Amino acid sequence: MLFCHFPVHPKNNHNLWNDGALTGLLARYPCVAAYVNGHNHAGNYGEKSGIHYLTIKGMVDTLKNSYGVVEVYEDRLVLKGFGRQEDREMKLSARAKP
């Protein structure tokens, strides 16, 4: 699981300028299960090449807080959302399992 401030997938005007290069690089490594980021306060989610790309909703400029806790299981990742952030279950592809 990787963490970064900027999103790279799905396509969005908040993404890193070289988002395609980074998603291509990450796809080469079967151990990568998820890429978690912020920056886009609206949040976002996509899956590409068996990797979950999760943008956590922002907690500034809103009346309601937003954050999440990720639980890691052998076959899935579970985001327990709080405030504006909704829960999400992300099944791990065979490529990311030990």
Where are these regions (language model features)?
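His/acidic metal-ligating clusters that form di-metal
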Residues: 1-52
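Binuclear metal-dependent phosphoesterase catalytic core
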Residues: 43-98
